[in-house]
Amino acid sequence: PTMAANSNEKTVAFTALTEDGTGTFTVDVANLNIKKPGMYYYTVTETPRNTAGVDYAAKSMIMVITAGYADDGEDSSLSYWAALHDSTNYNDKNSKFENTYTAGSLKVTKKVTGSLGDKDKKFNVDVTFTAPAGKTVKSTITYVNNGAESIAPDAWKLNTTTNQYEAKVTVELAHKGSVQFNNIPKDVTYIVEEQDYSREEYTATYEGDKSGTIANDVKSTTITNNKGDDNIDTGVILDNAPYILMLAVVA
């Protein structure tokens, strides 16, 4: 890139990646204290942030500032030209700091079994996400449950016991229902826990990954609620046949 021809603002724009796409940063040449003609070399590195799911560029770049007189010295003001080189490939002048964001998904499915299981009943399921230690979540997790829902970055709260950020949501699921959480940053951990329905004589079992760590894939768990197999008062099975009640009347 070349420096803007504005003597009052000596800045050079370079390409850089952010979690939102492509961005730029500026270098104020005036702050480099270049007073004489010549070529000046600077090492430019990126300082990693603490955004969950992001791998930051580890390489450095070489910034070359050339200071000289554009009019063979007749004008006493120095002009500046800038170039940014990849430190591993000096001929590459189009390099950038490239950060990689990786996310995964979590799918929770509900099944209801047993002769007394209510397949229309909605069960409350708590899902708790925990950010990696020292990290914050800046992306929005989306899911659909009774309409489009999301977990925004400001929904994450610091757990003062673990010193990690957490976000917790409750979803409703009936038989054969499911919910999938998308755009969960990698290395975020999760726990799926259905609320207690033992007083209603439901027994919950989990299949798959009830808890785990998000990666670049889809984690899944199925919660099965069973009721009734051991509570049937066995006897004559009526099915849908008429039930005839006989009364003996004693005169």
Q: Which stretches of residues belong to each language-model region?
A:
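Solvent-exposed loop/turn and edge beta-strand elements of beta-rich ligand-binding domains
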Residues: 1-251
